[in-house]
Amino acid sequence: MNALAATSRNFRQAARLLGLDSKLEKSLLIPFREIKVECTIPKDDGTLASFIGFRVQHDNARGPMKGGIRYHPEVDPDEVNALAQLMTWKTAVAAIPYGGAKGGIGCAPGELSTSELERLTRVFTQKIHDLIGAHTDVPAPDMGTNSQTMAWILDEYSKFHGHSPAVVTGKPIDLGGSLGRDAATGRGVMYATEALLAEHGKSISGSTFVIQGFGNVGSWAARIIHEKGGKVIALGDVTGSIRNKNGLDIPALMKHRNEGGALKDFHDAEVMDSSELLVHECDVLIPCALGGVLNRENAPDVKAKFIIEAANHPTDPEADEILAKKGVTILPDIYANSGGVIVSYFEWVQNIQGFMWDEEKVNMELHKYMNNSFQHIKAMCKSHDCNLRMGAFTLGVNRVARATLLRGWEA
C-alpha cells in the first residue's frame, strides 16, 4: 500500500471514530491547491534542461500551510499529495498553528552542480513566489534539499517581496535559522521515546535500541541514547549494518563516519546482514530511513517491544495489524518525528518577532510540546478505545475539523 493510500485509510478510520459527517470528511481530504510548474534552466555546459516542480497545499484551516520541498528523481504527485495531507494532521497533533503542504522537483540533485541547483531553485521560487509566504505557505528542507536551498529561496523570494526571513524555515543560522534546528527531529524522537517508556515504567537508561538509518535523525537519536545511558546494539545505513551486543561506541562511530568511513568498516563492531537489522533482538526499534520497511514479510519476526517511527510511513498497514497482535507498541510517525516541524515553528516565531532564542530555550519548549502532545494522544486513545496511531490521527483530524467548522467552511 503506497503512502497516499495508507494516509487516506488512517484518516478515514479516524473520521469514523470521530463520527464526522461524510461531507466534512470529503472536504478535509481534498487539497486546497495543487501547483505544477515547469522549470527550465541553462546547465553549466550551455544546454537547456527542463524539470517539473510540484507544490501541494493541502489545508490552511489552522494557519499557514507548512511542509518540505524535496529534490528526488521520483518525486511523484501522489506521494507529494500524501505527504502534504500528513503534514496537516502532524501540525495539528503538535498543536502548532499551521496547515499542511509538501513540494518537490523531479531531479537527481547528485547529478547537478551547485550552480545548476541554485538556478533550478531560483526558477522554481520565481514560479511559486506569489503562492507562498510567511502567512500563506512556509516551505522547509526535505530529502535532497538543505539550509542552502532555503537560503536561495529566501533570497529569490525577497527580490519580489522585500526581506522576508519567515518565508522558509530550516535556514542557515546567519540568515535567521534557529539554534537546535539541526538536532530537532532526532531530539524530538527521543523526547517521544522517553514519554512512551515512562508510561511503561522504563527509561532510555538500561534499554537496548536498534536504529535503521544513520543520517541526521538516526545519528542524533543514537547520540542522545548514548548520552542518556541507553545501548544502541545494532545500527544500519545504505553502506551496511553492524552490531555489538554490549552497545556500540557512538562517539567513536560518529568520528569514524565523519572522517568518511563506512559503517561496515568500524573497528569495534561485527558486520551483520542488513535484512536482519529490523528483526534483531532489542527493546526499542527506531526506523529512521525509508517508508514501508516493516511489512507482512518481516513483521512476524520483529522482536522489539516498542517501535518509534522516526521515518515517514515505515510500517505498512498489514505490518501494523501483525505487530498489534504480537503486542508491539508503535509510536506513530505523525507524532514521533514531529520535532523538526515544531522547531521550524519556533524559527518562524523568532523571525516574525525579530527576537532569537538560545538553544536551551528551544530544547525546553520542544520537550514541552512533545510531552503535551503525548498526553493528548493518550487521552484520545482512552476516549476512542484505540491504539496510539489512531489516537494521534483522531487528535489531529479533530483539531482540523473543529477549525474548519468554526470558519464555516463545511458546506
Curated annotation (Swiss-Prot):
This is Glutamate dehydrogenase 2, mitochondrial. Expressed in roots. Expressed ubiquitously in various tissues. The active site is at K102. It is found in: Mitochondrion. It comes from Oryza sativa subsp. japonica. One of its GO terms (molecular function) is glutamate dehydrogenase (NAD+) activity. Induction: Slightly induced by NH(4)Cl and NH(4)NO(3). Induced in shoots after nitrogen (N-deprivation) deprivation. In roots, first transiently repressed but later induced by N-deprivation. Induced by alkali stress. Up-regulated by salt stress in old leaves. Activated by IDD10 in the presence of NH(4)+ ions. Induced by cold stress (i.e. 10 degrees Celsius). GO terms for biological process: cellular response to nitrogen starvation; glutamate catabolic process; response to alkaline pH; response to cold; response to nitrogen compound; response to salt stress. Its main location: mitochondrion. The gene is GDH2. Belongs to the Glu/Leu/Phe/Val dehydrogenases family. It is an enzyme of class 1 (oxidoreductase). Its EC number is 1.4.1.3. Residues 1-18 form a transit peptide.
